[in-house]
């Protein structure tokens, strides 16, 4: 199941739709997660242009009144059969089955809070839900926190946010999926950080052909 994740920073522009469609077609994407979409109305009708066909389904979390946030998960219904949907103000969690492998699992798209308190509360909410679901997990997200000081330019110590993120990953038995080709996923002027990442459990790693 080929997955695409993108902090799109606003989905309103037409060229973004064409870029998404190109990725979906070239990489044969069957699951897509978008965050910071800033959309306040359903884009279900627009998704056909992005996906390229009608064999898809979506789940949406709208942006706030200040046009912040927004999360979208979209998937190929021929590949991934969703049986249950969960969502919060900045995340979507889908229970389902990867059809070709008869692999029951849980796939999530997450956009972390900028502030530590909000992020910690979201992590706790997600942890309780994922432990209750008790299925192999794959999470794609911009968590708005780094895991190690080396993931942020000019960061030299492990702060409280990093420790909480690390403990959350350990509590859920997740593995940080290595990135290839890029070291940082966010930049502003001279500031650079690795905020976007994929996390999965051992069962996903053992079934890497999925």
Name what the model sees in each region.
Residues 1-210:
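A shared catalytic/ligand-binding motif for oxyanion handling
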């Amino acid at each position: 199941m080929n997955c695409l994740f993108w902090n799109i920073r606003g989905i309103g522009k037409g060229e973004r739709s064409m870029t998404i469609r190109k990725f979906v077609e070239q990489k044969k994407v069957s699951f897509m997660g978008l965050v910071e979409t800033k959309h306040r109305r359903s884009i279900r009708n627009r998704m056909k242009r992005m996906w390229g066909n009608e064999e898809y389904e979506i789940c949406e979390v709208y942006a706030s009144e200040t046009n912040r946030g927004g999360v979208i998960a979209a998937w190929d219904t021929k590949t991934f059969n969703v049986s249950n949907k969960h969502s919060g103000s900045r995340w979507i969690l889908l229970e389902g089955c990867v059809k070709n492998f008869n692999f029951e699992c849980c796939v999530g798209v997450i956009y972390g809070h900028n502030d530590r308190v909000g992020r910690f509360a979201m992590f706790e909410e997600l942890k309780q839900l994922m432990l209750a679901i008790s299925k192999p997990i794959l999470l794609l997200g911009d968590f708005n926190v780094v895991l190690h000081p080396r993931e942020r330019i000019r960061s030299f110590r492990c702060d409280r946010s990093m420790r909480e993120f690390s403990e959350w990953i350990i509590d859920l038995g997740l593995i940080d999926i290595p990135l290839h080709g890029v070291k940082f996923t966010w930049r502003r002027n001279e500031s650079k950080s690795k905020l976007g990442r994929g996390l999965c459990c051992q069962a996903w790693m053992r079934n890497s052909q999925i």
